[in-house]
Amino acid sequence: MSNMPVNPPSWRNDTVLPLPNEVKANAWAVDAACSGNPGPMEYQCIDLQTGAQVFHYGPIHGTNNIGEFLAIVHALALMAQKGITDKVIYSDSVNAQLWVNKKQCKTKLERTPQTEQLYQIIARAENWLRTHPV
């Protein structure tokens, strides 16, 4: 059993998680999940230094890409609100990163009574991006 990974690896003393060397532990990681697409969607943020959940939202009817987008904006807004300037945000969603850079959620999700609340959250996120430096 000596080949089993140690959590955390002995060479990482800045995290409780098994992170590769190139990943900064002083960071938050965001991710979304969706059961079906569209379907029940939720997202969360984890502090890589402590492993603690920073926030969680959902489930709400949506898509995975929307959840990834909202998770990034939620993390950015929370960092701004708390005056956190020394952390990195990690996201594995290229689409969400592009949408954040363009300050617009480019979803094709149909706007219906079931998705209206989500569209209001998206509008709030887009407005936050337009009114804050990212």
Residue ranges with predicted function:
Residues 5-66, 70, 77-81:
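RNase H-like nuclease fold core
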Residues 29, 33-37, 77-134:
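RNase H catalytic domain
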